[in-house]
Amino acid sequence: MNENSSRYKRVRGVDKFMTGVFYGIGGFFILLLIVLAAYIIVKGITSIYPGVFSFTSMGIGNQFFNTIYLVFLSLIISVPLGVAAGSYLAEYAKKGRLTEMITMSIEALSSLPSIVVGLFGYLVFILMTGMKWNLLAGAMAVTILSLPTITTTTRDALAALPAHYRSGSIGLGATRWQTLWHVLLPACVPRIITGVILVAGRGFGEAAALLYTSGQSTVLNWANWDITSPTCPLNVFRPGETLSLHIWVMRTEGSMNPHSVEIANVSSMVLIIMVLGFSLLARYLSRKLDEKNKGAAK
């Protein structure tokens, strides 16, 4: 009895110790994020000067718009392709060498350095097409980086669904496609949104892949809405410097600009607020959709 009691106390002690270690590790990373975000935001606030948010060469308004627009373009391309690829792998692909090769290719693609993707994009989307740097080429480069995450997230989300989702729908007379579209994918929306959060955050902060594709210049005329014009904000075939690229330029080549340090600090602040804000909003929507799905299931 005493031996069992001492063993129980020892196991409980180890359990409490490991629980404390895990809480400590989690708290450390949360604290690290808070300190990093606070430092960047404080540096940005103290660097604000009149005109920093303007849509001129002395402001970051154009770069802010380019960042949002480029991520939007990349999501339009990557989300449908990634969801379709993940759905195929989870619901239609038969186990075999072809499926294994596809899975291996996705894993290899997810580990590619962004600079390699940027050089590939420069070769294919710029040199081979004969075009200059443009936003669409940048969006395609970000899409290449985003596809593995969305595909894997969709595949894993579909694979994790209970079997009765499929059997119940098919038993009621639905086809495989109707089951996928009306039952399975809606149930996976919260997890798919999580994947979209990750790729959007990467798109906001991407620099190396865009250096060779979207370019480092931005000349916009906000009075010009002719989409074929190179100065139209909505023209996808114009160069477009994003905030992350602007930070790099201001820190390396911005010595001619008297506010280069301030612009880099404010750009960093805006960028991290964008990433955190988008993540919080997407998490909120994901949780609401998850609650809605659980309520409908009851």
Predicted features, each with a name:
Residues 93, 155-159, 170, 197, ...:
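C-terminal transmembrane helix and the adjacent membrane-cytosol boundary/short C-terminal tail
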Residues 65, 69-77, 81, 85, ...:
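Hydrophobic alpha-helical transmembrane segments of multipass integral membrane proteins
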Residues 52-58, 210-271:
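Interhelical loop and adjacent transmembrane-helix boundary motif
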